[in-house]
Amino acid sequence: VNLNQRNDYWISDGIQVYMMMKYMDEFHPQSKMMGSIARFKILKSFNLVNLDFNQQYSYYYLLMVRKNLDQALNEPKDKLIRFNERIASKYKAGLSFNYLDSYLEQNIIPTSIKEFYALSSAKQVSRSDFETLLKSKTNKNLDWFFNTIIDSRDLIDYKFGKIIKEKDSLTFTMKNN
């Protein structure tokens, strides 16, 4: 992708990880994060060995968050700490695209990626091109994605609101603190 790798690196990194996640889901759904070492019975009790391959992205991202090393995805690359530059920001971007894909449905992310690549072959593209392209494909509001997920390091912290107990089910509201 022909874009400014100092400021918009997260787009190409996110596309790369997102595509890897989709590939693994489709062609290797049984693969584990630790690979064939997961087959050894002596290691079965360790949670890390039992994680699916794509769960490693969440694992490493959460490792960064728990150590309070999270940085916004739109932070210039030269301002990132080494762990974020090499690992966690890429995973966060890929997970964010995967989350957005689930939210938008209708194959919007894969289609937008193809169009973004085509656009980048003609000119240098930027975040605004990517944002405009995504917003043109849906009627859903995407400001939350760019303002909260990309531009800030605000953590998503859900809290249960009102809980209604019925005969055979529970109804509840969730809100982000």
Model-derived features: positions:
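Hydrophobic alpha-helical and helix-loop surface patches within well-folded domains
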Residues: 1-176
